[in-house]
Amino acid sequence: PVGTMKRILISHVNVFNADSRYSSIISGIPGALIENVTLSDIHIYHQGGYTEADGLLTPPEQEKVYPEPWMFGTIPAKGFYIRHARNITLDNVNYHYEKADGRPLFVTDDASDIRYRNITVDGKEFNTAN
C-alpha cells in the first residue's frame, strides 16, 4: 500500500547553485495526493538556461520507483512543479537565476488549492494572477 504525505511545513531555507533541470518538485502519484504543505521564507538560486520548449514537457509518472528528481527528466517549471497535490502554500519564496530561463515559474497538474504569496523573481514581484 501507498503511504501519505500531509501536514508538512518547511521554512527558512536557502538553496545555492540549484540544478535547473529539476527545479523543485512536489509530486504525489495518481490517487495518492500530497496534502497540506506550506513552504515559506525560501531563497533559491538557480543556474537557469532552459527554453520555452522545455516548459512544454510532461514528466513521466514513476510511481513504482524511489522518488529522485532525475527520474522525471527536465522539469517544465523553472520554480515549482506541483502534481497530484492539494492545499499547497508557497509564501515568501524568492527565485534568483544566473541565466534567463524560458519555462513558466510554476506548472501544476492534478493539483488544487495552490496558493502563491509574496513571490519574487530576481528581486521583482511575480504576478501570480497570470
Question: Where are the model-predicted features located?
Answer:
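Extracellular/periplasmic carbohydrate-active domains that bind, remodel
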Residues: P1-N130
